[in-house]
Amino acid sequence: DQLANSIPKLLLTNKIRYVVDNLDKSFFSHDLTSHSEAEIKLFNVQFSFLAHAYVWGDENPATVLPSSISVPWKKISDLLGRPPILSYGSYCLDNWHKIVDDEEISLDNVALNYNFLAGIDEDWFVTIHVCIEDAAREAILATLSIADSFADDSINEDLSQKYLEVISTSMTVSYTHLTLPTKASV
């Protein structure tokens, strides 16, 4: 966690490769079977950021990752059924928290856990997607329910309500997206 949190400073000072190259091969010795899926996803986020910072954190991209990060990252990725890359899931969906836990997800209540350069632009670029995903949740659930209705040949009166949920949620997502220029200019 400390190393992943240090990425912006390590990139700024061109020390990311030096620090990673000098890690003990066993610096990550967690028994992954004793961790929850959320914890494993967090490990994946951390290693994804470390690996990509290592590769792109110097004038010339690195072509090989040190085993101190590549071996655990591969194990973690395999457990999650994902390739070892910094995917949308790792960069966005598994990489945020609410600032105030008992408040709704909103543009003013979401923050990144990890980033590359610790800038407001990077945070905003990712957190807007968290809010859009949250706003779209009801439409996705309604769409899945509609698909199930068609699959079961049991279309009923509730179908029109599901369509209205999709439309309503789509409008919420559009509103969230439209606030981007306002917030980005701050």
PLM segments and residue spans:
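Non-transmembrane, amphipathic alpha-helical segments
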Residues: 32-35, 39, 120-131, 155, ...
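Charged, amphipathic alpha-helical oligomerization/scaffolding segments
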Residues: 127, 131-134, 138-141, 145, ...
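Helix-boundary capping/turn motifs
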Residues: 15-18, 39-45, 134-138
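Short, charged/polar, low-complexity loop and linker segments
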Residues: 108-126, 142-155, 162
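Long, charged all-alpha helical bundle/coiled-coil segments in cytosolic proteins
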Residues: 24-110
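Intrinsically disordered, low-complexity acidic/proline-rich regions
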Residues: 1-24
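Conserved small/polar residues in nucleotide/adenosyl-binding loops
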Residues: 176-182
